[in-house]
Amino acid sequence: MSKQAFYKRLTTQQKKEIDHQKMIKMVKEYRKKVGSKTGGIKLHNELKQDFIDAGIKIGRDKFYSFLRLNKLLIPKTKNYITTTNSNHMYKKYKNLVKDKVPNRPEQLWVSDITYIKTENGHNYLALVTDAYSKQIMGYKLDNHMRTSLCLDALAMAIKNRKYPNRKLIHHSDRGFQYCNPKYTTFAQENGITMSMTEQYDPYENAIAERVNRTLKYEYGLKKTIKNTDLALKMTQQAVYIYNNLRTHFSLNLRKPADVHLNPNIKYKSYRKNNVNLPELTI
């Protein structure tokens, strides 16, 4: 090898190493800002313009190899188990949305409760999410699971409506909080129709459970948090990032807040074998 070729090769290798250090920094900064569990496809989609601006040319496959080489791939997480107390005497409503999909924002809301561990014991997070845009419309964190927890989350969601005159279905499991007449009456007084799961099928409330999982695994809510005040601050930050900064495959790598205001996408079901489900007609 000639001296000229040697130095050219050395310069190329040096540039590659510098580019890799730049990309490592970009990936870490993006994950710190948006979510520590952001995967490779989303990273490449969100950072490709930054790479171009930095003079870095890298396709998706090579980017995956780069992530693997630098131990930046996200390990797969195990499924978690949810429990619902449906052993009560309250009225249980029919499932109005089974095997149907929404075609606009504020046509279908899904609600669920998850727990957040703190050093002082469990806290509970009630969420109301728009099924079409995936935007979290309302939430409430507290140290109890009483009906008021879910009522406060629903009240926030109603306050945050962008299309208040549209007909809306509220879908949840059959937990006593959602079946409580205080909750159902409040929903119905605000023009909301109740719908509930019929049995434990993960697809019957898949969106709500997926949101729970995302918040816990991507934004640090899975770990034991010092106290309720810190848990609330972390939840507020997580919801903001989830709604405004995090891209979603089901939204064609757009963000929930954007889709909620600019609803021009076709809904994608989480059911892999049922991609052409009929649309809701409410």
Label each residue range with its predicted role.
Residues V97, Q107-I116:
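Two-metal-ion RNase H-like nuclease active-site motif
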Residues T118-Y124:
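Short, flexible loop/turn motifs enriched in small residues
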Residues S133-I136:
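Hydrophobic "anchor" residues
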Residues Q188-I192, T214-I282:
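C-terminal domain-tail junction helix/linker
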